Amino acid sequence: MLLTGCTDGRPKAADPAISLERRMREAAVRDSARLLERYDSTAAAHPALAGRLAPLRAAVAAHVSALSPAVPGAPSPSPSASPSGGTGAAAPAASGEPVPAKPEEALTALADAERSLSEARTIDLAGAPAELARMLASVAACGAVHVYLLTSTPGAKP
């Protein structure tokens, strides 16, 4: 006697934890990509800040890659992308907000964006699956360090 298994032809329901994680990762990637664009806009508007911003920008690009859901063949952002030189005038940031004309104010605006995103990620920890929560915590901590670096005077003693 031969027994065969049958299904009713309907697709299996998606694992809600997996879809929650995927949605959270996709939102985190979008947020980091917007922050990455702000770094690019700020460096383009203030070329003298580009060197100071480069390592922070590279870290944000790494966050985009690390948070991205595994999609075969998907390109990742370049951590070494260099924006074109600007005139120092206010340039529109990717978020639609202009980059402030003064370098100090541009750094403050970038620090505010980092702070807001770091705080949002900290809040998201409560609902995230364990592995993603650990990653969000790490990225949020990195954002807090970026806030410090963006608002401190280079070379000054603490």
Identify the role of each PLM range.
Residues 2-158:
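All-alpha RGS (Regulator of G-protein Signaling) helical domain and cognate RGS-like helical scaffolds
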